[in-house]
Amino acid sequence: MGSEINDKVYLSKGWGYVAAVSLLPYAILKSLWAWGSTVGLTTKQVVQSVIGFGETLQEGSSFLYTLYTIGIDFTALLAVLASLFAIALVTSWGEKLPRWLLIISGWAVGVFTVIVSFLTVFQFLGILPKGYTEGLAIWVYVVTYGGLFLWGITVFMATLSFQHRMKTKRKKNNLLLLYILNILTMAEVFYK
């Protein structure tokens, strides 16, 4: 009984839905900054840096600059694509995509999340140097890094669930094929 409950949680499609919404606060925050908001910025230097980010983009890619001028931060767009990837792991249209692509990508996300998590712990312990942390409210780190961590873990779990569902579906399809072959074989023997 306990194993069935664990399997339901472990193999739930809910992981993909949680992953899909985990990056939306990040996408909203980055979009707010692209629209000129200073929410979460605590120093004038960082405010000027965010405000001047569009000018920095103007010197580089015209595509990224155009997106930014209409209020679309490229990383926010990537967050939305990452959410769509998570949804693909739990919906019927995702099952039409190449399985290997979703499974390899999902496993890579899981491994990468574990590595980054260890590196973050090492930074907090002082084993690795910390990056520049001035100028942003602490909740900004929770929204950005917390969302990325949650996304990584839940995408990994959604991948395991997807892998299990596809394996079960393949077994059912193989049984159906064997059943049809048996019927055809019996029909062939009967008509001989």
What name fits each language-model region?
Residues 17-36:
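N-terminal signal-anchor transmembrane alpha helix
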Residues 5-19, 61-68, 95-105, 134-144:
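Membrane-interface helix-boundary signature
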Residues 57-80, 139-153:
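Hydrophobic alpha-helical transmembrane segments
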Residues 32-49, 118-129:
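Membrane-helix interface motif
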Residues 112-192:
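Alpha-helical transmembrane segments of multi-pass integral membrane proteins
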Residues 2-12, 84-108, 166-187:
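Cytoplasmic juxtamembrane regions at transmembrane-helix boundaries
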Residues 42-63:
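Perimembrane loop-to-helix junctions flanking transmembrane segments
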